[in-house]
């Protein structure tokens, strides 16, 4: 009897830790999210309205920022942009600038293949392949849910890999639902 209680307690604890690690991994990936063209960000410098702005990153990935000139933001995280602007404003312009950068709107993801309405859709954090397909009107009758691929750009290189319907997508992903052959 006590042996069974120990087993159940151990199993419950193992599941709890697995869920905690999984949740932490999801948060970690969004904190390491690299900005790309199409993302809308808000740059705020406390008490400095002329240095605060909301902007969509253009295709070239650079913005003109007051006093600092052209800044290339594509491939950087929000924290790295904060640091870049903080360091640039520190000393010559402000004594101790309070800079924050937030992602207001992520770039869209694209879904094609065997979905009813292929195209680009706004990304939302926590979006799985299944939810993305639902946004695209659902799967067609010929969809092979076991043959789904994602093309994702990381550090300037494109990678293609197979995923399941429960895997999470990221902004800018191209999801392809392949056709099932009867």
Locate the predicted segments by residue.
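Ser/Thr/Pro/Gly-biased, low-complexity, turn-/loop-rich segments
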Residues: 2-4, 22-182
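Bacterial N-terminal signal peptides
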Residues: 9-20
């Amino acid at each position: 009897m006590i042996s069974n209680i120990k087993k159940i307690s151990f199993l419950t604890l193992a599941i709890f830790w697995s869920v905690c690690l999984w949740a932490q991994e999801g948060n970690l990936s969004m904190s390491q999210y690299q900005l790309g063209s199409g993302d809308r960000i808000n740059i705020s410098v406390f008490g400095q309205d002329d240095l605060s702005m909301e902007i969509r990153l253009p295709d070239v990935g650079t913005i003109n920022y007051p006093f600092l000139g052209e800044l290339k933001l594509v491939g950087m995280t929000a924290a790295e942009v904060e640091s870049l602007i903080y360091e640039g404003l520190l000393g010559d312009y402000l004594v101790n600038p309070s800079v924050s950068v937030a992602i207001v709107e992520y770039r869209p993801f694209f879904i094609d293949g065997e979905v009813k309405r292929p195209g680009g859709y706004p990304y939302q954090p926590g979006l799985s392949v299944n939810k993305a397909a639902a946004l695209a009107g659902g799967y067609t009758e010929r969809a092979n849910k076991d043959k789904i691929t994602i093309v994702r750009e990381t550090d300037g290189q494109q990678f293609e890999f197979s995923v399941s319907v429960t895997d999470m997508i990221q902004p800018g992903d191209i999801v392809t639902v392949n056709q099932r052959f009867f």
